[in-house]
Amino acid sequence: LTPASLARLICPEFRFGKTDPEEAARLVELGVGGFCFYGGTADEVREASRSLKALSRTPLLIAADYENGPGQWVRGATELPTNMAIGASGSEALARRKGGITALESRALGVDWVFAPVVDLASRPDNPIVNVRAYGEDPGLTARLAGAYLSGLNSQGALGCVKHFPGHGATATDSHLALPVLEKSLHGLEREDLQPFAALARQADSVMAGHLMALALDESAPASLSRAALTGLLREKLKYNGLIVTDALNMKAVARDPAAGVKAFCAGADMLLCPEDPFALHAELARAFNNGQITGSAVALAVSRQEALVRKLSPFRSSPPPLDALRCPEHLAFNAEAAPACLAWLPGKPDLEFRPGDIVGYFEPLTPPSAWKGTAFVGELIKLGVRVEPYQPGCGMRLAAGIFSKPRAFSGSINLSEEEKLVLEAAIKGAGASVIVAFGSPFVLGGLEHKPSAGLCAFCALQDFQLAAARVLMRRAKAGGTIPAVIGDL
């Protein structure tokens, strides 16, 4: 066993504007198995991928968290609808197309391995980190659409990663900040959260192990560090034979444990993602090998799983798409075409209609007009003949409230703050007819004492989805989706 063999177990982060390229070059010399890219311009990402791969003696896997397309992280690339928007449509064709576009643009950037799809279930409105990243709360819908997305990725030469095993949906803690505890019974996990992982076990290129304490599986270690979870359940019971990668080891759920990387490998992980100090982790792995905690055969098996992924990529690696594949007309058209099928009215409420000549007050809680995020929505209403003004309470004017709430790593919160909820309810109470348009989390529509006349969910704030929401309200388009989760207390 060589030091480079141990290094191949490590996949450090490469954060543009922060990571020292010389340090990255030293990591390549050490023999790491790949990098996870964050940020950057298109030119920067492609050049970093090219130069790192050229330095490496073994094939590098370049990964990125492009859940909603590369445009989520890379300026100049296409951002695509959230999983929950696709879930609302129920369309495998849209899921597959999202995967295909993501793969083409990722490969144009030199990224081979997309850390998607999320198959966590949207089973808790207060979950601060899953929410619209999930397809919905139904495991069957999730497995079906995630499978279609994976087929789209693979068809265009990129690898996927099903995450976050054994399911992060039923928690209320962001694992970037602390260790979530999942209190479901084993029967509950098998009936719900584990279903997508079981259904996709043969199809998934890789599975990401989540940093969450699933008490029904292991009361002493989070799933990412648990042999009972990774080997006993995922490998032996679910018959998954592909590569297991940890979630980022610099997340606070496990970062305080200096032995987390070694524990994860001993539990059954094949690649150790984004450690705080990759060189220190390499030294820890070497010590664990020297004292017999890690065996050469286990390392060889993990490396062989990496090599299997590299072989899967080999037909595509010699001919990456050109950079002009980014934001090409066909990819941009996808969002406009998909939007009407993804938008969904709140059930149990009448569909609200605006007409040319109507005066409508627009409102975003605690946000002055100069900072509105819904400018495309407002602009389209005006274009279609509505007179839109900043909402004035107590005038009896019709109200359109735009809510932009989405999961953000390290924020620890989601949906509306108490202050936002108070000002929103006051606006609804003082309005004539009112509609809340959720350009993100649909759960903002639940739990309000003063409820709107209607609710429309777009599940994301992409420009084409804002335009579609305005057209739906003007009866120029039909909202064809169904909210794929239960919105409580309507």
Give the ranges of each region predicted by the language model.
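Surface-exposed, active-site-proximal loop segments in enzymatic domains
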Residues: 75-88, 124-135, 174-180
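Active-site mouth loops of central-metabolism enzymes
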Residues: 7-19, 83-97, 178-192, 250-255
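Catalytic domains of carbohydrate-active enzymes, especially glycoside hydrolases
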Residues: 24-38, 97-113
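Preference for extracellular/luminal or secreted protein segments
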Residues: 1-31, 236, 257-490
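Second-shell loop/turn segments in exported
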Residues: 16-17, 37-39, 83-93, 131-139, ...
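Second-shell residues forming the walls of enzyme active-site clefts
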Residues: 26, 35, 40-64, 70-74, ...
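A substrate-binding/cap region within the structured catalytic cores of diverse enzymes
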Residues: 90-111, 118-134, 139, 146, ...
